[in-house]
């Protein structure tokens, strides 16, 4: 989407540098990587591509995991590829999220009533009931995260105290989810920011990573 292109312009290199700093093992022969991969075609709200006679609609339904998320909807199969807007038995990474808007974007996905959905993480889902379960599960994750952080901020809690409150609320339901432990510090940091009035996610840098860990461990 155009919104994702703007994100690449704004923070693409910083994100690359941050990920390399966190997970150098994933960047084998990093010096051979020529740089960011730039899109050659973008769209504002919706675009159709045709695979033979099959139409695939690329649609920006709203912000959530990032400001620029899209879904791919295959009308004749009633199937959707949701990207990280929907996860299944996996934690959502919310470090660049728009948490208050995300549930409304999930409403829009639900309104398509897909009979199959491929989430960002987790099993491919067959059957409307299972798809609805995944959407509800993602909604619960996002709402529990943000609602707990919002209450903590309203009570004047620190980031470290908010992290503890979020763990208490989320661990019983979500601690078994894939990548939960990895995502939680970044998720709480973003939820804390958004609840504090920082609507646009702050760019992640190595310095910001260190600052976050200092506050959580201090």
Annotate each language-model stretch with its function.
Residues 3-4, 84-85, 121-123:
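Active-site metal-binding loops of divalent metal-dependent hydrolases
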Residues 3-60, 76, 106, 113:
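Metallo-beta-lactamase
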Residues 41, 80-81, 118:
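Hydrophobic/aromatic beta-strand patches that form the interior of the parallel beta-sheet core
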Residues 55-112:
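Active-site-proximal loop/helix segments of hydrolase catalytic cores
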Residues 90-94, 151-154, 192:
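Short, well-ordered beta-strand elements within core beta-sheets of diverse protein domains
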Residues 154-218:
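C-terminal regulatory/interaction regions
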């Amino acid at each position: 989407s155009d919104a994702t292109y703007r994100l690449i312009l704004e923070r693409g290199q910083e994100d690359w540098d941050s990920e390399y700093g966190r997970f150098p093992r994933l960047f084998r022969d990093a010096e051979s990587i020529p740089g960011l991969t730039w899109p050659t075609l973008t769209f504002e709200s919706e675009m159709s591509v045709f695979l033979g006679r099959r139409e695939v609609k690329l649609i920006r339904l709203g912000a959530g995991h990032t400001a620029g998320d899209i879904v791919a909807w295959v009308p004749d199969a009633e199937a959707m590829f949701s990207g990280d807007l929907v996860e299944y038995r996996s934690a959502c990474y919310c470090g660049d999220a728009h948490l208050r808007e995300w549930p409304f974007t999930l409403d829009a996905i639900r309104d398509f009533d897909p009979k199959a959905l491929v989430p960002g993480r987790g099993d491919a889902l067959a059957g409307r009931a299972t798809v609805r379960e995944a959407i509800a599960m993602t909604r619960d994750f996002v709402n529990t995260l943000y609602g707990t952080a919002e209450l903590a901020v309203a009570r004047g809690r620190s980031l470290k105290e908010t992290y503890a409150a979020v763990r208490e609320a989320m661990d019983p339901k979500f601690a078994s989810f894939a990548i939960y432990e990895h995502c939680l510090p970044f998720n709480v940091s973003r939820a804390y920011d958004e609840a504090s009035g920082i609507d646009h996610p702050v760019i992640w840098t190595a310095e910001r990573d260190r600052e976050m860990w200092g506050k959580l461990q201090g």
